Amino acid sequence: YLADTAGRCRIVVDDARLALAREPDQAFDLLIIDAFTGDSVPTHLLTREALALYGRKLTAEGILAVHISNRYLDFAPIVAALAAEGGWMALDGADRDVPEDFARLASRWLALTRSLDIAKRIYSTPTSPRWQWQPALPGPTAPVWTDDRTSVTEALFPNPAGVATTP
């Protein structure tokens, strides 16, 4: 699909944070992070320091889109806590048509921006009835991960889909 894009597209194969650090500040309108669906998650992409880097590289109206779909880990409170601490607005978008097949996973994204105008536009953009945006809230105990401290156990769903529990 990249070959068919009308825009200019450059692919960089490297550690995301190291490569992004070499890019000029305020050079991007959109950054997409899509690295959390699997069982091995790069937590260093969801830290205070990482969010500060993304903020420097995005334009004033830029959007950080984070694909957080995961069967066992709920990254929404983690990212929302980072956003709140860093002065970002965060919107949680999810496909409300959850698949019954355990092999499939509903799509869930967080959109972060520092622009109130952009946040309002995302929130009010008509989407399908299956897809809805709502404010992403960190909750009272959501941790702020840093380069020095992360713990995936803080992101565990209380009862992941498809995992048997005993009464």
Predicted features, each with a name:
Residues L46-E61:
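A short glycine-rich, Lys/Arg-flanked "PGG" loop and its adjoining helix->strand segment in the class I
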Residues T37-G38, S69-L73:
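Short "lid" loop at the C-terminus of a central beta-strand within the Rossmann-like core
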Residues E61-I68:
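Conserved beta-strand signature within the Rossmann-like core of class I S-adenosyl-L-methionine
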Residues I32-I33, V66:
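Redox-cofactor binding/interface segments in oxidoreductases and associated redox assembly factors
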Residues T37-L46:
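Glycine/threonine-rich flexible loop motifs
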